[in-house]
Amino acid sequence: VSDKVERILHPEEFKMDVLLVEPGKYPQRVQIGTELEDLQKAVGGPIEVTYPFDDPVGIICNEEGKLNGMDLNRALYDDEGRVSDIIAGPFLVTGLTQDNFQSLTDDQMVMFEDKFHSPETFIRMGRSIMAIPVPDDVVCEKAEGMKPREKPAPDIEAR
């Protein structure tokens, strides 16, 4: 039986449960196909895979995200807690086999949702860049399509 026929007969076998992390949003557990086209669609273009963690997981991101001006998303940190890279655009966190991607385990799903839970904004400070977590109320308002609340000007009495 050909691979294409197998995919039609058993489509669930060619899907994986992964974490989708989009700029300005909380991570989401999603089910995605394992084909290159599925991965490219999820990240909005050609894919690049990085392996920044000791766990058997990969980060699939848009290879041209920074070049194309996609929104900065989340920082990756070195062992000393310094920003080592910033991912631009949406990315996927997937489990790994010896030669392919696979679903994250439940423990990995929880661990990486926690690691990437807070959306970040970035500030250049001299030669370094700082990642600042976005407050929950701002994330929630963006999700509802609202602008962040503006603080009213304090009442000042003329003396």
Q: Where do the protein language model's features map onto the residues?
A:
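Detector for the mature cores of small, proteolytically processed
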Residues: I8-A42, P46-P148
